[in-house]
Amino acid sequence: MKRIFLDTNILLDIIEERQPFLVASANVFDLGISGHVQMFASPLTFANCVYTARKNVGYMQAIHGMRQLKHYVRTALMDDAQVTLALESDTSDFEDTLQYEAAAAAKCDLIVTRDKKRHFPQRGIPIMSPEEFLKDYHQL
């Protein structure tokens, strides 16, 4: 079973029902709910989601939404090792590198993000948009 790491923007699409992104992000999430993939996110993802969503839907709704999503998303550990690796990396985006290191520690097969800049390290974990992942998944 594929282990996928969900970047912050994917969970925000669902919590905030952001258009036109909701359908693709929700379809990825549905694969996790139905047990076809295992979904992971880092503690940083959860914090960033609540922080960002509270501005648009309010704090309590942001917490409620994350609680609902957390039933299906495993927490990828982020500790001293991931912080050290991110600090020693030569990438230009520290937060993306932290996320990448959390995904690597959780042995994720890929990262799903809508981040078009994709400043993640290029060391082996594929980076895909929700649409790319869904197309790839349905071709398996």
Which residues make up each language-model segment?
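Active-site-proximal, substrate-binding regions of enzyme catalytic domains
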Residues: 26, 36, 44-83
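Active-site phosphate/pyrophosphate-handling residues
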Residues: 9, 27, 44, 81, ...
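Short beta-strand segments at enzyme active-site cores
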Residues: 41-43, 113
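Active-site neighborhoods of divalent-metal-dependent phosphate/nucleic-acid chemistry enzymes
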Residues: 74-117
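A generic structural signal for short hydrophobic patches within well-formed alpha-helices
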Residues: 11, 46, 83, 118-119, ...
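Acidic, PIN/NYN-like endoribonuclease modules and their adjacent C-terminal/linker elements
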Residues: 3, 72, 104-140
